[in-house]
Structures are given as structure tokens and as C-alpha cells.
From Swiss-Prot:
One Pfam family per UniProt: Glyco_transf_8
Similarity comment text for this entry: Belongs to the glycosyltransferase 8 family. Galactosyltransferase subfamily.
Catalytic activity of the protein: myo-inositol + UDP-alpha-D-galactose = alpha-D-galactosyl-(1->3)-1D-myo-inositol + UDP + H(+)
Any one cellular-component term (Gene Ontology): cytoplasm
Protein name (database record): Galactinol synthase 7
Organism: Arabidopsis thaliana (Mouse-ear cress)
GO biological process: galactose metabolic process
PANTHER family per UniProt: GLYCOGENIN SUBFAMILY MEMBER
Keyword field: Carbohydrate metabolism, Cytoplasm, Galactose metabolism, Glycosyltransferase, Manganese, Metal-binding, Transferase
Location relative to the cell: Cytoplasm
GO molecular function, one term: inositol 3-alpha-galactosyltransferase activity
Amino acid sequence: MTPETHVDMINASEKAPKERAYVTFLAGNGDYVKGVVGLAKGLRKVKSAYPLVVAMLPDVPEEHREILRSQGCIVREIEPVHPPDSQDAYARAYYIINYSKLRIWNFEEYNKMIYLDADIQVFGNIDDLFDMQDGYLHGVLSCFCEKIWSYTPLYSIGYCQYCPEKVVWPAEMESAPPSPYFNAGMFVFEPNPLTYESLLQTLQVTPPTPFAEQDFLNMFFGKVFKPVSPVYNLILSVLWRHPGKVDLESVKVVHYCPPGSKPWRYTGEEPNMDREDVKMLIKKWWDIYNDESLDFKPKSPADLEATVLESTIIASVTEAPLSYSPAAPSAA
């Protein structure tokens, strides 16, 4: 049986005060490093008070690590986490590598962290999320309207959390209406060694599902999940799926996750990528990325040395690798 998750297991409120930080994930030698650089500069632009930790797999080349250190990021190497079964079960094969994100629950030198995918950009200060109630995982509800959800009964009946009132849950459905389900590109959490161990143990007895770690985290934290406003994680497809639900002036976080929307790969040729609002958000990302005034500028050589030293010390704390299956390919 799957171990039951309890609120007190993830509650860090009784721990001594520690640091806060943002954290993202990076794997491989591809171009996602550009996303992390853009995110680091975006956090500086909105004057965030907290650093960005980059949890990265061993296959990230030293050249990319140096780029991130030069942008003030704290580099922390982690070992991959592999689920017990093959990647055939996933909506996209590369999703399997995202289970490695579970390692961030072992970053116990931090009291609270905000996870952000590397294809996210912040356009407003979101430090207030650190003040969310302890003992819960906070995130933004997912939209179920894109074709990638077509394997689910939710998609077949047109149900979506953004507009649940539009579809009456059919009585003939064998299951009850779904529990709230968050997008794992952004969430607020509390690192905790007990939670970390429970996550890894639970993974060993949990069958894989199409959305990999996102499904897993929703299952694991289902009883302690609390939704936050969509302004903290605008999934780009909501622009055309639920236009009446979007006020771009108030959006603080944009998630460039639909196919063709990664700013550093953008061509405008994929479906919906020629929309004016999409083009505007792509331009805003590039404006931040290209703004040299947002590059990390240590106040003194000692500040730069401290950033490098912190990355070095953290990287020296190695994780025990898990050997559930052969190594998964790096994220594209």
C-alpha cells in the first residue's frame, strides 16, 4: 500500500528559522540553461530578496555551471531519481527525468522554497508566497483543455478546473469529480528530510502515470495542497483556452510550456504561437534576457567568492543514487 501522507510530516514551522530561496531544475547540455539565466535575471528585475538555487544533474557541463554562477545562482548537483518502470507510460518520454525534482525536499538548509521550472519567467515580485501558511504545499490549478490531456475522461467531457461550472459531472462516470490538481511548474514547499524519505519510498510502490512527477506530487500532497491565484503561474495555453480568465496586467509569472513557446526556441510556426499576446510575452522574456543591466554584479570580489564557495560546499554534499532503472535521458 502507498504510505499515507500526514500534514505534520511536512510541517517545518517548528524548525529553527532558516533561509528562503527559489529553486529550479536543470539537466543535460541543451539550451535550457538559457531559461535559467532568464529566470535569474527576471528575479533580479523584480527585486526579489532571495537567491536562486539550481538543482542540476551530473550531466550539466561545467561551462553551463560557470554561466549560472556568474549570474549569481547557487549551483547544487543532485543525483537522478528513476521510477521503477519504463518511460513508456508517460505523455512525453522526457518527463521521466523530472522525478529528480524530488531531491529538492532534501535541501534542509532552507526553511521554505519556491520551485520554478526553467521555462518560467517572473514579471512581478512573488516573495509574498514565502509567507503562505506552513504545513501545506501551495500551487496553481492546471488547465485540462490541451490535447495532451486527451487520454483522460476530464478531456473527453470537457471538464476543466478553470471553468468547472461549464460542465456538470456526469452521473454515469464511475469516479467522483477530481480533487484539485496543480501544475508542478511552480509550487511553494518546505524541505524536510522526513518528507524526502517518504517521497522516495512512496515512489518505489507507485505505478507510473502520464504526467510523471506532476501526477505523483498531486497524489502525495493531495491532502495538504492549497491553491493560489493563477497570477502566480499563467500557463500560456490559458490565453486561448480561457481568455476571459486572464488579466495580463496582473500576471506575475508566465509559464512557457505549450509546444513552440520556449522563448529561446520560438519560431512562431506552431499552433497559437502567432497570437499577438504570445508574441508580446515572448518579447518580454527576451527583453529581460538581453538586458545587461540585470546581469549579476557582486558588490565586491568577496561576494562573488561567497557565491562560488556556497555552490562548491553544497555540491560536495552528495546524494545516494537510486537504482530503480537504467539512467533516463536528459531533459530536452
